[in-house]
Each structure stands twice: as structure tokens, then as C-alpha cells.
Amino acid sequence: MGSLLRVGMVCPYSLSVPGGVQAQVMGLSRELRAMGIEVRVLAPCDGPPPATFVTPLGKSLPTSANGSIAPLAPDPSCQLRTIRALTEEEFDVVHLHEPFTPGPTQTAILMHTAPIIATFHSAGDSAAYRYLRRPVLAASNRLAHRVAVSKDAKELVHRYIGGEYEILYNGVELPAYRSSPALPSPTPDTPTIFFCGRHEERKGLDVLLAAMGLLPDEVQLWVASNGPDTARLRAQYGADERIHWLGRLTDTDKIARLQGATVFCAPSLHGESFGVVLIEAMAAGTAIVASSLDGYRNVATDDVDAVLVEPGDVDQLATALKRLLYDDVMRDRLTTAGQQRAEHFSMRSLAEIYAAHYRRLTADRAERLLRHERASDERALMRPRSSRMLDRAFRRPPR
């Protein structure tokens, strides 16, 4: 083992598709590399890898999961690439995100080439846990350390396989949200709402679009990303010129839109284990209206650093948006508190905690190997002298 700690970060989701887990994998990897840890990300990619430290494992297949469509790669070719990468790289530690999701993370557990740290992100329920409980439970014994990103995520995995879990909330690369130039509203005084999330039922975009009908005519809405409901929603609301359909944004453009918006809205209905999008808005200095979900309450407190409303309530959402769009004093109070709250979710702080776990697991493994070598030497010395002489007699001569 060299002096430089080598970590294999394995993600089951395609890095070519925006998503919360993918963002955490890449952000955490960047911070760890900046700290001098050699991290290589193993993940599916449906295009060029997003960074030089990414090993692409093949293309993904859209798969239904947790009320969403996940870009997974459970095919045999992806698993063969995973096996090859794990074998050739000889990582000191393997860090799996969503370890029991079909694809490379499951393969990495079966390979078990190094101590494994596992981070669980999902909340709510999981078909993988329900239908694969026995093999998942057996495989869980190979996990050296378990992390859940929220209490909800811990509750889900503990319900099926038990065990001890450390709760480490997700992180945000704070400097990026404070240094990017803001993209101005259509006109400087135009009240503007920003939505950024997959266009599917659980994200609540339907509710926000319906609420727009109750807001003043001057209010503008930026709708980023896309999804299975995009065509239907655009057909239904496309005539409203106040709604701007932006499509998928780069990280830089997303941050600029956050900083340029008056209010960020996260109207999700369910299935949110942790509110990273809220931390991003807080870090960017943008006021927030969001659904009062457990995952979002991990981050935000109503009337302290955000306004939280009942999920799916169009009237309540419209009322909260109108109030925050036009109350400058309230917005300033919430954004100031939000920026302070975001400090608790620094990606650098999260990376330092994980780095300490990597070093501990590496040291534990080295100690076990040393004890094993000593025990082997002791057993050899205790063997009869005649047996040792036979070993020497039949030992192959060196070539």
C-alpha cells in the first residue's frame, strides 16, 4: 500500500443524468481530491465522463424506482467493467453510494476487494429491500461502516436489514454558490420564481404551475430540467408567456439562475430524503418556499430560513409565494438565516469526516493483516520439524 490513500467511489446512477446522488458523488470526490486523497469514481455514463477521475462503466437503462425513473446499469457488461476496475485499481477503501441498488454497487459488495463504507440516500420505501431482503441482509455483513444521509434514510434501511448507522447529512460546495455571477431577472424589478427538478409527479411541478394562475400577471417562472411529464405540462401551460422552459442546465447556469431569482420553490409531494436543493438555494442567498416534508425539515425551519407549506395545496403555495415575492423585509430575514444555515452543510466538512473514516478502515485492515501474518508464522514454527523438512525437500527450486 502506498502512502497516498486510494478510494474507489462507486455510484449506481449514470453521471450523465442530473440527480442528487450523482451530485454528492462528484462534489465529495472533488473535495477529497483537493485534500490529497486519490479518488476514482466508478459509474455508468451515457456520454463522455464528466471528469478525468471518472471511470465509465457503460450506458444506463431507465428504471422505475422510488416514484422516479433512475438511470441504472444492471447489465452484465457493466458488471464486468466494475470487476475489472476494482481488480486493477487496488483501492485501499471502496465507498458505495446506494449499495443495494442493482448494478455496480452490488457487484462491488460481492467483490469485496477492500474495506467498504456504504452511504444510504433513499427514503420512503424500496422494492430492492422488499424483494431481495435475504440476499441483501447477507451482503450487508460485508459493510465495514454504514452512513445514512438523514433520519428517514436510516429508518428505511434499518427497517429491512438492521444494523448501526451514522447520520451524515449531504454537503454542498459552498464557494461555488457565492462566486458565480447572478443571472438577472427579465427586468430588475420582476418578481421571479425558480424551479429546478425532474418533471415527474413527486416533484410537484403540477402544483406550482397551477399556483401560477393565482399569482399576479407580472410574476415570472423559470422551469429548469425535464422529465417524463415535460411534454404534457408544456402542452397544458405552454400558452402562459410568464413561464420560461429552460431545459437541463449546467451547474454554472443553475447557480446563476438561483442567484437571479426572487424565490426558489421546491413543491415536492413525497420521496425526498434530504433537501440538498434547499441548501443550494440558501448558499446562493435566495429565499425559499418549499413543501413541509420530513426530508426538507432536516434542512429548513418554517419562518426561520424558509417558508414551508402543506404538500399539494395549490392555494397555500400561491399565498406563500405571493407574500415572499413582495415582502422585501421577510425575504432579507430568511435569506440571511439561510446563508448561516448553509454553513452547517459544507462539502469540505463532510469530506473531512469521510476521510477520517477511510484512514481508520485502512489502519484497521493493516492491523488485521499484520495479526494474520504473525499467526501464520507462529503456526509454521509450531509444526513438527519433520514436516518442515519435507516442505523444504519438495519446494520448487527458484527459476
Residue ranges of model-derived segments:
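Short hydrophobic beta-strand element within catalytic cores of glycosyltransferases
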Residues: 287-290
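Conserved acidic donor-binding segment of nucleotide-sugar-dependent glycosyltransferases
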Residues: 302-303, 307-314, 323-329
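Nucleotide-activated donor-binding/catalytic signature segment of Leloir-type glycosyltransferases, i.e.
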Residues: 231-253
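N-terminal strand-loop element at the rim of the active site
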Residues: 4-5, 11-18, 25-77, 84-85, ...
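Conserved donor-binding/catalytic core segment of Leloir-type glycosyltransferases
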Residues: 184-203, 209-216, 222
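Carbohydrate-associated surface elements
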Residues: 152, 171
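Membrane-proximal helix-turn-helix segments that form the acceptor-binding/catalytic region
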Residues: 124-146, 153, 159-160
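A short, well-ordered alpha-helix in the C-terminal region of glycosyltransferases
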Residues: 330-344, 356, 372
